Design a protein with these regions (language model features):
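Phosphate- and other anionic-substrate recognition elements at nucleic-acid/protein interfaces
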Residues: 1-48, 55-170
Length: 170
């Protein structure tokens, strides 16, 4: 992949190009766009977001078969904003959000906020999050533990609910 200016970019390049006119502020989306350019075949055309709800909400994003982000959120509003940014800018045939069932009140809040704020369809899967928390030697690495739990949640199966935007269902 070559990163260049729009002016210097050849019109018919044999290798993937990323030009400087890209105006993506979300690093996860930028990583996803780079993967899109590099993956011509798209063997796995899916976007999977794993969420470990709690005081510190773990977050993991898998796109085209690769993990492109892993982070920690202290507020649900910031989490929802980032999920909406990712869902709206990364295109995939299958878009799935997997949420752990450890805090169902928070799981339902996340689901409802996504349904209210995002005007497109996606699937939500509530998964059993037992045994997703790994033992970490140093107590101060709890954020790392929540992010790893989100990754494990994104790899589990559960009950899938298709969410249609309220604008389509009334």
């Amino acid at each position: 992949m070559v990163f260049t200016t729009k002016k210097e970019a050849p019109e018919d390049a044999d290798i993937p190009l990323l030009t400087d006119d890209i105006s993506i502020k979300n690093l996860t989306v930028l990583r996803g766009k780079i993967l899109e350019k590099l993956d011509d075949v798209r063997l796995e055309d899916e976007l999977i977001i794993g969420i470990d709800p709690g005081k510190r909400t773990g977050f993991s994003v898998h796109f085209l078969g690769s993990e492109i982000a892993r982070s920690l959120y202290m507020t649900i509003d910031k989490l929802i904003d980032d999920i909406i940014s990712i869902l709206s800018q990364l295109k995939a045939k299958r878009r799935l959000i997997k949420i752990g069932d450890g805090d169902m009140k928070l799981t339902n809040k996340i689901t409802n906020l996504l349904n209210l704020r995002y005007c497109s369809d996606f699937d939500i899967e509530v998964v059993d999050e037992s045994r997703t928390t790994v033992k970490i030697k140093h107590f101060n690495q709890r954020g790392k533990r929540d992010m790893l739990s989100a990754r494990y949640i994104s790899q589990r199966s559960g009950h899938v609910n298709s969410v249609l935007p309220l604008s389509r269902v009334g």
